[in-house]
């Protein structure tokens, strides 16, 4: 920042989640520095907040090895062009939002040119490919981390890191309105309710749906009034789930929902879900849960050798103990899943204790992340 020009922040977001984070950061920065300039690779939300887009975010939003290889030349061209143009612009700070495979190399290129760099959202280096931490340390002046154990990991390697809390924890109330969610979904207040969330990826839905449905059938024997809600992320996953249900449990009555995962979690007494961000969201919804996950045997064998954590779900990683039951591979079968869910549906001591711990963990990571991120950017820009 100089007397001649406004504070200039360069940003690169590579997918929708990054666009949401970028928009929140820009909004918080504009409140403090109204004339700041924002430029880079932006999605519609960031652009709506005033970010000048040199490239559209969709240019970077490619998934899968085949898709990346098909777009590799274009991606390398964009990264080289951004290195050149940001180098000429000399922004006060560069913020790479997630998209580590693209952004960390770009951050390193810019840092060599004397530009201060932030990586916003830590990759899962604490879980696997831990040696990436050294590349991140060379490429960035600061990592912004959502979770406290991420900061503890970076501290071990003397990589500057700031824990800012999680934006999802800011967005969700500490005490959700369960009856309000049931009103929205048409679930009676006095019914037992189970949410099934078999994942957002096709492979997960294919691998988990049958066992999740069989588990629900077993639970219906104990709770004949059991309402079962199944939020599905899009029409393709819904069609896939309906096909599996027709084969496995054609007579099982369920509420299929288009999206509405958060409402389903808040409304339910318990959830059975695949691991991932859904487990964190379920914790923040204060819905007791069991995590069930299965992958192809070779993939699991490889993952066991690569992954360096004791748990797979974020609630357990945050708690530092097995707060929620994780049933993986051969353990992920209807009898064991149902046995783990029964005490949660009973709404007794087990689920109340889990609820209380969920609330404590929510408070720990509810830190107004947008404001914290903006403060970190401004401090680095000085």
From Swiss-Prot:
Reactions listed under catalytic activity: 2-N,3-O-bis[(3R)-3-hydroxytetradecanoyl]-alpha-D-glucosaminyl 1-phosphate + UDP-2-N,3-O-bis[(3R)-3-hydroxytetradecanoyl]-alpha-D-glucosamine = lipid A disaccharide (E. coli) + UDP + H(+); a lipid X + a UDP-2-N,3-O-bis[(3R)-3-hydroxyacyl]-alpha-D-glucosamine = a lipid A disaccharide + UDP + H(+)
Keyword Transcription regulation: no
Domain of life: Bacteria
GO annotation (BP), single: lipid A biosynthetic process
Pathway connected to this protein: Glycolipid biosynthesis; lipid IV(A) biosynthesis; lipid IV(A) from (3R)-3-hydroxytetradecanoyl-[acyl-carrier-protein] and UDP-N-acetyl-alpha-D-glucosamine: step 5/6
One family name in Pfam for this protein: LpxB
InterPro entries xref list: Glyco_trans_19
Enzyme class: transferase
EC number: 2.4.1.182
Family statement drawn from the similarity comment of this UniProt entry: Belongs to the LpxB family.
Protein name: Lipid-A-disaccharide synthase
Gene: lpxB
